[in-house]
Amino acid sequence: MPIEFGERIRRIPAYPLAAGYSLGEDVAMLASNESCFEPHPDAIAAAHEALAGVNRYPDPSYQPLRRALGDRYGIPPQRIVLGNGSCDILLSAGEALLEPGAEIVYAWPAFSVYPHLGAASGARAIEVPLDSEDRHDLDAMAAEITVATRLVLVCNPNNPTSTSLALDEIESFLGRVPSHCAVILDEAYCEFALVLGDTYASVELLRSHPNLMLLRTFSKAYGLAGLRVGYGLCGSEALRAAIDQVRQPFYLNTPAQAAAVQALGHQDEVERRVAHTVGARIELSEGLRGLGCWVAESDANFVWTHLPDPDVEAEIVSGLSERGVLVRAGSSLGRAGALRVTIGTEAENERFLGAMGELL
């Protein structure tokens, strides 16, 4: 007799894994929105030094990293939640806030992990379509919030569409969300978003919204994707405590903590790398438009493009792969006929545009 699994397993969608990790070195990896820059040398050195102590469990209080983040953003450490990547925090938030009979509201397409929260908890997931410019339709989202809504997710900049909401739009929306409902503003790509001004701007929203969390990561601008370090800045200690209550112990390893603390200390280098990425993003967008593609106004470290003929998506993705260029197909992210393309090195970007010129 086969093993009987829980009913929720049948509801949870599989995460769309990126391909290419076993294809060798001569591949342009433009599918996972990683940084094309290595971590800062001090972050690498800190992680290496920390390896000598991994016979011991990590510091379960994570105080050095909490304090470093608190000092940077002016947030008390007890209102900062950490995680093994921001996905870890998202899933824990779902476990803490959702249950059968509750509701979760988010735009779609958005980050591929969002559907897991409702499916795993048995909560009703309400997916609100993006508007005609592939941006969040905040009016439509607000209209879906009820007394049963426990959690609202806003991905800004949005993954996979790269589009952003201005701070005043977000602030107005938050004023329409009842206090019983938690809001996670997923800001994984905020460092690249010129429309937001700077990474401190949205932190001010926490002063008047105790139900709000700003979810961020070291995987993108800081180049620590392989170490998996995410963090959330919470409007209240109660929200942080509820999420931590459902966590496994020792969820953030010692080298990752050490590297993240060091990475925070080199903001000038982070800003230089972000500026380089933004410049390359503009060039890549212009190149795609020159090939007849519609390209969203990106505020991330990737671009989102609609192909001139949506029916050739699979052919284009396959042709790029044959030429050693890996991108993410829109059909795997909720919108057929599109591509999500990470900003890579200058050589990788040129290789991608050259391949697209051959295929279109």
Describe each region flagged by the PLM:
Residues M1-R56:
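N-terminal "arm"/small-domain region of PLP-dependent enzymes with the aminotransferase-like
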Residues A45, E49-N84, R281:
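Conserved N-terminal alpha-helix of the aminotransferase class I/II PLP-enzyme fold
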Residues Q63, P77-G101, R228-G230:
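Conserved beta-loop-alpha segment that forms the PLP phosphate-binding cup at the N-terminus of a helix
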Residues A96-V154:
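PLP-dependent aminotransferase-like
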Residues A119, H136-V147, P160-V183, E187-A221:
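Active-site pre-lysine segment of PLP-dependent enzymes
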Residues D168, D311, S318-R328, S332-L360:
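PLP-dependent enzyme catalytic core of the Aspartate aminotransferase-like
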Residues N211-A296:
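PLP-dependent aminotransferase class I/II
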